[in-house]
């Protein structure tokens, strides 16, 4: 049987009587007295197409013994279904069992816990929940590119292997060809001069610094790729490998940055509502009641702006026993962020102008000498979902800040060059793709929105 029709296309058809070839996997089998029903799914949509197999089929007895998970090809006639809840069914005229699956197949017809499904991550895309997750993930990734392409942004592929730690937190995964059982030493430290790159290198924690360089040549750019953090955090929100979206705008200040972030998040919310309806309805029904209402509210609302200092005032007045202290100069925790967005504002809010001592070296210093032009976008139920800043374009102040933080100029000479010649105000932000997916699907663990999660002590598959 050559060619095939996707299940999604067959279900959307309006031409009963048409002959179709369907190829996919058996989700369920019901053997009746005079007929057998197979539910076939090929991943193109949530819904399976029912295939009706009658005893006249030459290999009918083989079909009756077919196992859940088997790969099949079916040629048949599409017809209106008399059963409630389904528009069409396929009356089989020929059925080929391409790849059988026996009773040892782990995904039998029952509900499996997410914890168990993580142990068989190579098979979980075949379930309803994870089929929906990864269809939305794919559609959302395409929407990211479309948003920036429609606005004239250049897509930049920044390096995976790097010699710099953009965030300065020392959370790099080291990349080396040295024999670490007997590493060469110099003054008591590993000597990387004989290594592949002749210096210490690691996996990138962010493409921002390289993105800034391209923004000062192409004006508006974005990166979208994998990033890595050797952070030993075993939480539902942390992974060692994840994807980041990082736009950068030349000739822009903090509020222009915030305006782009608002447009971007609203665009993505509308995209999943308009283009992923079946999967989003599933999440709303099975995973997170009220999800659709919350996503629509973000898409339709105007985002507020609040100073960090004002947020601290609200938190200090709150009649809530926070687990973490609230003081000016301390970073906000998720409980604080959620209180601000849910109780004080009642919707999305940008917190702006944070104390400089809790932010990165590259953020532009404000005139008060105490704060930097940083912003975090907070949304209900999650807290921070986007973080960004205006970058420090003044070479003298950037050098001064690097010295205060003990950051070696020599390793960032190329970054500093961008401030020596033709420097201009610029700004950008970062959005963790998996955090976004968690927000838009209601999935509560980052391990469940990435195909093969990388977390402490786990790098299977």
Swiss-Prot record:
Enzyme Commission numbers on file: 6.1.1.22
GO CC, one annotated term: cytoplasm
Reactions the enzyme catalyzes: tRNA(Asn) + L-asparagine + ATP = L-asparaginyl-tRNA(Asn) + AMP + diphosphate + H(+)
Keyword S-adenosyl-L-methionine: no
GO molecular function: asparagine-tRNA ligase activity; ATP binding; nucleic acid binding
InterPro entries for the chain: Aa-tRNA-synt_II, aa-tRNA-synth_II, aa-tRNA-synth_II/BPL/LPL, Asn-tRNA-ligase, Asp/Asn-tRNA-synth_IIb, NA-bd_OB-fold, NA-bd_OB_tRNA
Main subcellular localisation: cytoplasm
UniProt-listed Pfam families: tRNA-synt_2 (PF00152), tRNA_anti-codon (PF01336)
Keywords recorded for this protein, A-Z: Aminoacyl-tRNA synthetase, ATP-binding, Cytoplasm, Ligase, Nucleotide-binding, Protein biosynthesis
GO biological process: one example: asparaginyl-tRNA aminoacylation
Location of the protein in the cell: Cytoplasm
Domain of life according to the entry: Bacteria
Subunit record text: Homodimer.
Family in the record: Belongs to the class-II aminoacyl-tRNA synthetase family.
NCBIfam families associated with the record: asnS, PRK03932.1
Protein's UniProt name: Asparagine--tRNA ligase
Gene expressing this chain: asnS
């Amino acid at each position: 049987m050559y060619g095939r029709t996707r299940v999604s296309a067959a279900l959307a058809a309006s031409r009963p009587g048409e002959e179709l070839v369907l190829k996919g996997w058996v989700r369920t089998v019901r053997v009746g007295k005079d007929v057998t029903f197979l539910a076939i799914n090929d991943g193109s949509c949530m819904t399976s197409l029912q295939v009706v197999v009658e005893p006249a089929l030459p290999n009918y007895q083989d079909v009756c013994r077919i196992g859940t998970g088997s790969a099949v090809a079916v040629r048949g006639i599409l017809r209106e279904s008399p059963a409630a809840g389904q528009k069409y069914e396929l009356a089989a005229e020929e059925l080929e069992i391409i790849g059988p699956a026996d009773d040892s197949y782990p995904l039998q017809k029952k509900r499996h816990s997410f914890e168990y499904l993580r142990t068989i991550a190579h098979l979980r895309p075949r379930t309803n929940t994870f089929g929906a997750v990864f269809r939305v993930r794919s559609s959302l990734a395409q929407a990211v590119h479309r948003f920036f392409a429609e606005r004239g942004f250049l897509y930049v592929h920044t390096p995976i292997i790097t010699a710099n730690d953009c965030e300065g937190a020392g959370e790099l995964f080291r990349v080396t060809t040295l024999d670490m059982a007997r590493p060469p030493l110099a003054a008591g430290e590993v000597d990387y001069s004989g290594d592949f790159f002749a210096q210490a290198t690691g996996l990138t924690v962010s493409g921002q610094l390289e993105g800034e360089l391209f923004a000062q040549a192409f004006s508006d750019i974005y990166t979208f790729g994998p990033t890595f953090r050797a952070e030993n955090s075993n939480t539902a929100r942390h992974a060692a490998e994840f994807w980041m979206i990082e736009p950068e705008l030349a000739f822009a200040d903090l509020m222009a940055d915030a305006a782009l972030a608002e447009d971007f998040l609203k665009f993505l919310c509308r995209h999943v509502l308009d283009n992923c309806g079946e999967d989003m309805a599933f999440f709303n029904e099975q995973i997170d009641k009220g999800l659709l209402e919350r996503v629509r509210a973000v898409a339709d609302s105007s985002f507020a702006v609040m100073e960090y200092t004002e947020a601290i005032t609200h938190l200090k007045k709150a009649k809530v026993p926070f687990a973490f202290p609230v003081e000016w100069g301390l970073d906000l925790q998720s409980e604080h962020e959620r209180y601000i967005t849910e109780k004080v504002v009642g919707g999305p809010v940008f917190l702006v102008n944070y104390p400089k001592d809790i932010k990165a070296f590259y953020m532009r210093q404000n005139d008060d000498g105490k704060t930097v032009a940083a912003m975090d976008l907070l949304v209900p139920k999650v807290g921070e979902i986007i973080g960004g800043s205006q970058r420090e374009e003044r070479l003298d102040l950037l050098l001064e800040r690097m010295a205060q933080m003990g950051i070696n100029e020599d390793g960032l000479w190329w970054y500093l060059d961008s401030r020596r010649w033709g420097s201009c105000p610029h700004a950008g932000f970062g959005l963790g793709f998996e955090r976004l997916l968690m927000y838009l699907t209601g999935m509560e663990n980052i391990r469940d929105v990435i195909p093969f999660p990388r977390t402490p002590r786990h790098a299977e598959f």
